[in-house]
Amino acid sequence: MVSTYLLANFGGPRHSHDVEVFLTSLLTDRDVTGGCLPSFLHKRLFSFIAKKRAPKVVPQYNCIGGYSPIYQDTEALAKTLSSHLDAPVITFHRYLPDTHSQTIQQLKTLGDLPVVGVPLFPHFTYAVTGSIVRFIHNHLPSLNISWVAHFGNHPQFISCMIDHILEFLQSHDIPTHDCCLLFSAHGLPMRYVNKGDPYNVQCEKSFAAISERLPNIETFLCYQSKFGLGKWLTPSTKEVCKTLKTNKKYVLIVPFGFTSDHIETLYEIEKEYIAILIDRKYQALRVPAIYQSPQWVQSLATIIQSTRYVEKHSLIKS
């Protein structure tokens, strides 16, 4: 029986009016921000933080065109992927609440038919993929769904990443012997890691597999987008950009934990980190997210069809 696929991504503001709603949905998610406050206090506190933060974030979106492309890119990917899989593909945008009812209704119409959930995140964390799984389970507890939990170490992902990087170097006439790659993944609070979240281990294995096949290129793994208090995974991308010591002429930042470009690649990497490297006299460039690779859709289809699916209960943080 042909499955229906649920293509899940982060979601992002489609215009400036979406920013506060997006941030509120993100920050009030306990899988993301955690804490021990009662639910009603947690929601009030982080709704307030989102409201205060939104005016500071809107100008960042204005710098990248006034919106995040992640929504439209995910919708476009779903259509193309559907033809590759020869099966229906439904989209889910985790932090765009006004899209949720349509997704839930589409899934309800499937009854007992099998669904395969495909979060577009190479490396599993309870804070992102786990949150997606929890949301679907809470709203559709009887849905016959299993999940592609992660794919960061899948041979097809590794090969696609390597081809994507090498094609970028070739298109910019950058010699492999004279460049350094900073693989930038999203950060994670150490309190998650200390409780057994496998995210950093998966990132390290994925990074090692890619670096092994790029022996002539200097590579570093780092983590970006720290938010709030407490210790996060290190080294931070920003600190690496400030302190990097290499004799290579070119330094490229590769979005590693992101399959789609969005505010954290188009603004944080492009406008902040690249600027630091340029100020330090490096020839610095951002490599587009793997979504831009012409091989990505076929690679993703292969990953989906060759992965052992996981049941929801092992993916939700208790």
Curated annotation (Swiss-Prot):
Q: Where in the cell is it found?
A: Cytoplasm
Which terms in the GO cellular component ontology are assigned? cytoplasm
- Recorded metabolic or biological pathway in which this protein acts: Porphyrin-containing compound metabolism; protoheme biosynthesis; protoheme from protoporphyrin-IX: step 1/1
Keywords noted in UniProt = Cytoplasm, Heme biosynthesis, Iron, Lyase, Metal-binding, Porphyrin biosynthesis
Listed PROSITE patterns? FERROCHELATASE
Q: Could you say which residues bind Fe cation here?
A: 186, 264
Q: Pfam family of this protein, just one?
A: Ferrochelatase
Tell me one GO biological process term.
heme biosynthetic process
Supply the enzyme class, top level: lyase
- Molecular-function annotations in GO: ferrochelatase activity; metal ion binding
* Major subcellular location class: cytoplasm
State its Enzyme Commission number(s).
4.98.1.1
What does it catalyze?
heme b + 2 H(+) = protoporphyrin IX + Fe(2+)
**Physiological role:** Catalyzes the ferrous insertion into protoporphyrin IX.
Sequence similarity: Belongs to the ferrochelatase family.
Record's HAMAP family? Ferrochelatase
Q: What is this protein called?
A: Ferrochelatase
Source organism of this protein record: Chlamydia abortus (strain DSM 27085 / S26/3) (Chlamydophila abortus)
